[in-house]
């Protein structure tokens, strides 16, 4: 999709290419799951504003061995079947069935590139085989009162899917817990011949050409389709899966990373999250001689990536991408600051998302006056302020540190 709910972060890039967690892109989490699960033939279907995503895949994910038949390849619309672009998630796969035919795999795994979670897809394949299923949908338990925003799965005692409702007004509860609903994670595993049949038939119908709205609901009437209960490799008390399709969800997911014991663990070396490693110097924190006057470069409960210079400013509960500069007496709280942002002297920022290449002039305040913020920036209903990439603010700024 176009990622319109994540605007302005998707103004110049596809949603999976949006920076996340300081040094990553959103798609890195799905691709890391693939590699950690032992998958080695991966096609990334790209369409809208794809340059940034395509470049990231080439730079960050050129890690496999083509001589062994391994690859991660970005595939734009080929127009082999018609002159149409991808008309939906199912149509995107249908238009690229020639790739599947070339490889002739026994199973076809279809994933969303804009979710954050850790999952071993090999375990899902084992589940499909054990249940002699034609298809399996990854599912996670979720409070039933919050499930109306997602695709909800109704299952029997054996987890065979009985119904599939997209954003229902009254979600179906789980059979063993009426306070929980089963949500679709956007993870679909098929026997390849079954997927080919239903995708080909759907292409001839007047539908949305969507897995959740069309393919799966039709399959559960005719085939053995099961829900696979998400086994989280994040290893926390509460399972972690986030669809970060809105600014609020994006901000909240970044804030999940900065606690002393973060909800999502980036530091588990048994399940590494891979990305492009830019050649940046170490982060630097300077000026400690004037603590009483507030001139102290410090970052608390925060992530600061390579190349960052906290030069007499204070950062708290925030995520800083590479090469961010925070100057004297500036204060940044509960914010996501992307690459090459300069934050001037005496600036105050709270609950903001600032995209790349923005210079914040001295004495600017962001996140304190909703009306003033709305006149210049995007502000969500919950008060999160989003500033687009390269936005020019009025006053000049001194960038020496």
Please describe what each predicted stretch is:
Residues 1-258, 373-390, 400-401:
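Unchanged
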């Amino acid at each position: 999709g176009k990622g319109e709910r994540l605007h302005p972060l998707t103004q110049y890039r596809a949603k999976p290419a949006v920076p996340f967690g300081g040094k990553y892109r959103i798609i890195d989490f799905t691709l890391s799951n693939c590699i950690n699960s032992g998958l080695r033939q991966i096609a990334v279907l790209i369409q809208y504003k794809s340059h940034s995503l395509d470049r990231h895949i080439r730079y960050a994910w050129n890690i496999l061995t083509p001589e062994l038949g391994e690859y991660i390849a970005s595939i734009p619309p080929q127009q082999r079947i018609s002159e149409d672009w991808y008309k939906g998630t199912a149509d995107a796969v249908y238009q690229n069935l020639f790739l599947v035919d070339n490889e002739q795999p026994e199973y076809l795994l279809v994933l969303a590139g804009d979710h954050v979670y850790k999952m071993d897809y090999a375990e899902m394949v084992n589940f499909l085989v054990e249940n002699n299923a034609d298809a399996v949908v990854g599912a996670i338990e979720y409070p039933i009162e919050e499930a109306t925003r997602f695709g909800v799965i109704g299952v029997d005692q054996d987890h065979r899917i009985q119904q599939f409702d997209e954003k229902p007004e009254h979600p179906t509860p789980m059979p063993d817990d009426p306070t929980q609903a089963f949500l679709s994670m956007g993870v679909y595993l098929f026997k390849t011949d079954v997927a080919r049949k239903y995708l080909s038939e759907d292409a001839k119908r007047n539908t949305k050409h969507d897995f959740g709205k069309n393919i799966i609901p039709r399959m559960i009437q005719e085939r053995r389709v099961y829900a696979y209960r998400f086994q989280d490799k994040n290893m926390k008390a509460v399972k972690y899966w986030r669809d970060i399709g809105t600014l609020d969800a994006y901000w909240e997911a970044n804030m999940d990373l900065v606690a002393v014991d973060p909800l999502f663990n980036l530091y588990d070396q048994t399940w590494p999250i891979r990305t492009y490693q830019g050649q940046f110097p170490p982060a630097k924190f300077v000026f400690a001689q004037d603590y009483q006057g507030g001139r102290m470069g410090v970052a608390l409960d925060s992530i600061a990536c390579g190349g960052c210079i906290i030069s007499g400013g204070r950062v708290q509960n925030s995520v800083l991408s590479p090469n961010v500069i925070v100057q004297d007496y500036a204060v940044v709280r509960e914010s996501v600051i992307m690459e090459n942002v300069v934050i001037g002297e005496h600036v105050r920022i709270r609950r903001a998302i600032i995209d790349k290449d923005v210079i914040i002039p001295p004495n600017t305040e962001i996140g304190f006056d909703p009306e003033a913020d709305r006149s210049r920036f995007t502000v969500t209903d919950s008060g999160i302020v989003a500033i687009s990439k390269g936005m020019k603010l009025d006053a000049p700024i001194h960038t020496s540190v």
